[in-house]
């Protein structure tokens, strides 16, 4: 509870500073805008989700991470639109529930904390939707190209004896998909027009 209070206090301080700022266009990514407001909101959301208080030592790191995340999201959305990837409400709700479970969050408590810190729930929903859409795109593009050898499975099992062969196979495939995802994003960044204002 003390950590949550410290985080909330820190986020409220960021929010107080935010009200003094006139928000402007900060970055243009392939003609898509990212405003200073978007960056501040992402900083607050990241701090809240990570449970880390923003201070002088980590403030610039939060800013840099927020900017990188927002640029990546704009590029991912472009590619998702290009391939017309969509999800239904059931897929989203399942992904959202997994997110809460993985991060030990209760949905109602998190939404209350978002409201207390003037963070719109839609910011979180958009973040999660973008993640699931990107995962779906990467699977559609690269899953059929993955392959798993017995040696890779045995290596994972030798390091983690409690893992089944099926789980080890899934880990190898996920690692390959993550590498493909990173490469695609790097290529998109290299081709993108990114203008800092």
Regions found by a protein language model. Give the residues of each.
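Generic N-terminal leader/processing signal
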Residues: 10-11, 195
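Periplasmic POTRA and POTRA-like interaction domains that precede
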Residues: 25-49
